[in-house]
From Swiss-Prot:
UniProt keyword annotations, A-Z: Cytoplasm, Electron transport, Flavoprotein, FMN, Iron, Metal-binding, Oxidoreductase, Transport
Protein name (record): Anaerobic nitric oxide reductase flavorubredoxin
Gene: norV
Keyword Transport: yes
One of the record's GO cellular component terms: cytoplasm
GO molecular function terms listed in the Swiss-Prot or TrEMBL record: electron transfer activity; FMN binding; iron ion binding; nitric oxide reductase activity
Residue ranges of the region described as Zinc metallo-hydrolase: 30-210
């Protein structure tokens, strides 16, 4: 089976309706995928890429029905990964001397996967051309680390088609090939999901590479990707989206995700979200339980967000395994221009929230104060969670927010705060390690230190909520020192 792309270019790839895991289990392909291979018939016959190795036999059989394999003059491999070049062994068994054009790095990868160093490799670099007859040429553009070292794109003059490799693609299987034929909302979602989960680590390379390609001043009538649709209707729309996504992208959105053992951390997540929306009803807030949610949807939402709140219960003094794994993936994705805060519940001892805060900071997030609750949050602890959400909403606001008056939850709390404010409670104290501030008027309810407790009356076993160090590391807050 083949599909006419344009003039003498046909799609000869393979749809994969059933695939649900990609790159091991790193990427959930909930809408399947396709492996796009293209056959060009000019004076010279050119095959661009193959398909995933599991479809090798079907691919060669289908290709044979389109063309005598011996008539293929050149094979172009834009990318050596197995979902692109996987059928090479099956194909080259039939036409072993056919020239293969690829980057130098691709030769290393292809021979590493297929173990045929004797194949007729021809190295190409940016700006190299290959004459295919009828006044047309292929122009090669290296795109290293988008997303492998061997990656390149191929441009066909005359027809003005850019064979873009993984860039501008999506794991999206449909019986229709072109972007104007499919559901536009689904297509946009899958494009963004693909960029967020695969190309985000290389965003710093995207803009200069697109700028380099545009600098050739070549018309682009179509973008033929390696996965998903071919962009024939306004193909530059996806290029414009990539330029936007590569520029430290964020929306007015906050993502909250958590894992919980006894529902306590979930209660905290809900209360924090309530506090955020009290202060800023316009910010989009989405909550995920990592044990019940699609991991790649969570990461896509993190990509879209200005900030993320991550919650975990404490298990053996460390964070929950699913949270640890997801934070490790976030580290690899190298998100930029994002803020973060950790929260969670614990029992007799903690540890997870501090560990999580450190990991998020190591992942490149700008950190805000964390929040902890001991055992199941009661009405007072949940109010602290809501207040944390209010504080986060103001700290992370993209524009100044109007002041709002939030009622105290109980009359007793109002009295306590008023009394604390009126009393001479002595100075606030600041942790010399993590800079957390103890305010005597507020106390530290999570350690049973009531509002209005002077520092001298704070128990000796008090621990800094942020770094878990004792009272001896605290100094008088500099602004209050006399």
């Amino acid at each position: 089976m083949s599909i006419l792309v344009k003039n003498n270019i046909h799609w000869v790839g393979q749809r994969d309706w059933e695939v649900r895991d990609f790159h091991g289990t790193e990427y959930k392909t909930l809408r399947g995928s396709s492996y796009n291979s293209y056959l060009i018939r000019e004076e010279k016959n050119v095959l661009i890429d193959t398909v995933d190795h599991k479809f090798s036999r079907e691919f060669v059989q289908n290709l044979r029905s389109e063309i005598d394999l011996a008539d293929i003059d050149y094979i172009i491999i834009n990318h050596a990964e197995e979902d692109h070049a996987g059928a090479l062994t099956e194909l080259m068994a039939q036409i072993p001397d056919t020239p293969i054009y690829c980057t130098a790095n691709a030769i290393d990868s292809i021979t590493g996967h297929h173990h045929h160093p004797e194949w007729n490799f021809n190295v190409v670099k940016t700006g190299d051309t290959l004459d295919i007859g009828n006044g047309k040429q292929l122009i090669f553009v290296e795109t290293p680390m988008l997303h492998w070292p061997d990656s390149m794109m191929t441009y066909m003059t005359g027809d003005a088609v850019l064979f873009s490799n993984d860039a501008f693609g999506q794991h999206y299987c449909d019986e229709r090939l072109f972007n104007d034929e499919v559901d536009q909302t689904e297509l946009f979602e899958q494009c963004q999901r693909y960029y967020a989960n695969i190309l985000t680590p290389f965003s710093r390379l995207v803009t200069p590479k697109i700028t380099e390609i545009l600098g050739f001043n070549l018309p682009v009538d179509m973008i033929a990707t390696s996965h998903g649709v071919v962009w024939r209707d306004n193909p530059t729309q996806i290029v414009e989206l990539y330029l936007k996504w590569a520029a430290d992208y964020q929306e007015d959105r906050i993502t909250i995700f958590y894992d919980t053992m006894s529902n306590n951390t979930r209660m905290m997540a809900d209360a924090i979200a309530q506090g955020i929306n009290e202060v800023d009803p316009n910010v989009a807030v989405k909550i995920f339980n990592v044990a019940r949610s699609d991991k790649n949807e969570i990461l896509t939402n993190v990509f879209r967000s200005k900030g993320v709140l991550v919650g975990t219960s404490t298990m053996n003094n460390v964070m929950m395994p699913k949270i640890a794994g997801l934070v490790e993936e976030m580290t690899g994705l190298r998100f930029r221009n994002k803020r973060a805060s950790a929260f969670g519940s614990h029992g007799w001892s903690g540890g997870a929230v501090d560990r999580l805060s450190t990991r998020l900071q190591d992942a490149g997030f700008e950190m805000s104060l964390s929040l902890k609750a001991k055992w199941r949050p009661d009405i007072d602890a949940l109010e602290l969670c809501r207040q944390h959400g209010r504080d986060i909403a103001r700290q992370w606001a993209l524009a100044p927010l109007p002041e709002t008056n939030v009622k105290a939850t109980t009359q007793e709390e109002e009295c306590a705060c008023a009394a604390a404010a009126a009393a001479d409670l002595g100075p606030s104290m600041q942790c010399s390690v993590c800079q957390w501030i103890y305010d005597p008027a507020k106390g530290e309810p999570l350690q049973d230190v009531a509002p209005g407790t002077p520092w001298s009356d704070v128990p000796d076993n008090f621990l800094c909520p942020e770094c878990s160090l004792g009272k001896d590391v605290f100094d008088v807050l500099a602004t209050e020192a006399k």
